[in-house]
Amino acid sequence: MTDAPVSRLRNFCIIAHIDHGKSTLADRLLQDTGTVADRDMQAQFLDNMDLERERGITIKLQAARMQFKAADGELYTLNLIDTPGHVDFSYEVSRSLQACEGALLVVDASQGVEAQTLANVYLALGNDLEIIPVLNKIDLPGADAERISTEIEEIIGLDTSNAIHCSAKTGLGVPEILQAIVDRVPAPPDTTEEPLKALIFDSYYDPYRGVIVYFRVVSGRLRKKDKVLLMASKKTYELDEIGVMSPDQKQVDELHAGEVGYLAASIKAVADARVGDTITLASAPAEEPLPGYTEAKPMVFCGLFPTDADQYPDLRDALDKLKLSDAALKYEPETSSAMGFGFRCGFLGLLHMEIVQERLEREYDLDLIVTAPSVIYKVNMADGSTVMVDNPATLPEPQARESIEEPYVKMEIYAPNSFNGTLMELCQERRGTFIDMKYITTDRVTLQYELPLAEVVTDFFDQMKSRTKGYASMEYSLIGYRQNVLVRLDVLINGDKADPLTTIVHRDKAYGVGKGLVEKLKELIPRQQFKIPLQASIGSRIIASESISAMRKDVLAKCYGGDISRKKKLLKKQAKGKKRMKAMGKVDVPQEAFMAVLKLNENK
């Protein structure tokens, strides 16, 4: 299986925007090379999480090895490294690109170049990959190959004279793609005799064998039973098995430079075999690791609470297990007066947060309450120290702090130019600063803005999609922290502070957000037997208030006619009871109310 000389190895990946047909093309390549028998084939073969198939997106990286007989009669080994296309997983994309020498740039022939395609193309160019443009969905009635080719040339500057026209659905053009990979993607450098260095580009947790690590051998050889050292985590392991994915795992005895494979070594947690880490031999370690390893930093935080307090231990176990397979997830215990015990969790972005939440509910059968997402703020204290705050409820008091800085992102939005006005209005509303606007083609435009991440994480994406009828796509990257006049907005329900609803907002927007919040809560909280005041406050100053009127129980129903003093007595008794109820009563706040922060812009 591994006797392929380095000169006949090709490592490549597929770059595409969501829905441009990447997974379907991967399926077709596997089928055409006979890697997967036709009878075993199922759509999105490499996306093996249910959630991936359902959403039609790639979350975890997969890899597959194919044998292809080229035009020169030689048998070539092609390694396809699948990449996630979503902005949240861009670190994972950059690692898988590092494991390749070439990339197929798949563009939908009816849609054209989109934001995420571009971001990943620039990463690929930065890694010096040979890029082969492929125009997919050429069989669609709306396909316009000429226009899209010029678009690729103008935007990315790639020569599309030899772009391949294909339809991954029907299999048209797939043999040409395989031949182009052999002809145009360079073979890996032959560094088999140098010390072992292998790049980890993915890992997942297997309950029986521990962590399974996917890697690309950059130099040297790796044999079964070798003792290896992971350079970033400084841990050593003895290999239980090594092998290749075709796409099912097949064990081999040795892998040499340029090859892609997997290893199992009874590693306990994914955090010990971090993506981007370098594997080397414990007996003869390499002098320095491969460049580009960084720790995944969570950007978006939220509270996760079980709806039933008895499920707290189950939630903790579920998070511990998820952490084994998702090194980017961070969490710590948190208690809240309104919600009881739960966890404060950190995620790479909104999609990552949604996926973790869905996996917890689906795979571990939990019912969760999720608080509104927030970002991590940098608070400069009066005594000169700096505190990082990821939970708005823990923001230090105004007198103790000097200033607050919030993370900013640089955002690029690609859209048809008829939606220019509404998109600019949206960015303006979200405290965006206009940077640049370019016409890509006569009817498509790219807008560049800098805006606070906090304004992006709530519902920016949904708003952008609904304003542009789904035509716009966006891409953002962090550009650092900036100081702003920010305040903490608390919400009081019946005089009690509701921690999960606390937010940090810009002072100019505080009144609008506060008013919107209490109005939304008035709709969402059911009426009780007593009157419930809802207030939004900054410190001790109430800036907006509403109240939910009490349900009226007619205590006079039984008095037909009769003495007025009898009625007064009953009404007085009722008033006294309500007063006591108000002092003692607890308000049941439904889950929807905690997400009210997200829904503020819905009615606009």
UniProtKB/Swiss-Prot annotation:
Record domain tr-type G: where: 7-190
Membrane topology classification: Peripheral membrane protein
Major location category of this protein: membrane
A single GO BP: positive regulation of translation
Enzyme Commission no: 3.6.5.n1
Subcellular locations according to the entry: Cell inner membrane
Residues involved in GTP binding: 19-24, 136-139
Signal peptide range: none
Top-level enzyme category: hydrolase
CC annotations in GO: plasma membrane
Alphabetic keyword roster: Cell inner membrane, Cell membrane, GTP-binding, Hydrolase, Membrane, Nucleotide-binding, Protein biosynthesis
Gene Ontology MF: a single term: GTP binding
InterPro entries the record matches: EF-4 (IPR006297), EFG_III/V (IPR035647), EFG_V-like (IPR000640), EFTu-like_2 (IPR004161), G_TR_CS (IPR031157), GUFP (IPR027518), LepA_C_sf (IPR038363), LepA_CTD (IPR013842)
Main function: Required for accurate and efficient protein synthesis under certain stress conditions. May act as a fidelity factor of the translation reaction, by catalyzing a one-codon backward translocation of tRNAs on improperly translocated ribosomes. Back-translocation proceeds from a post-translocation (POST) complex to a pre-translocation (PRE) complex, thus giving elongation factor G a second chance to translocate the tRNAs correctly. Binds to ribosomes in a GTP-dependent manner.
PANTHER family with a match to the protein in the record: TRANSLATION FACTOR GUF1 HOMOLOG, CHLOROPLASTIC, TRANSLATION FACTOR GUF1-RELATED
Assigned protein family: Belongs to the TRAFAC class translation factor GTPase superfamily. Classic translation factor GTPase family. LepA subfamily.
UniProt-recorded name of the protein: Elongation factor 4
Native organism: Synechococcus sp. (strain RCC307)
Gene from which the chain derives: lepA
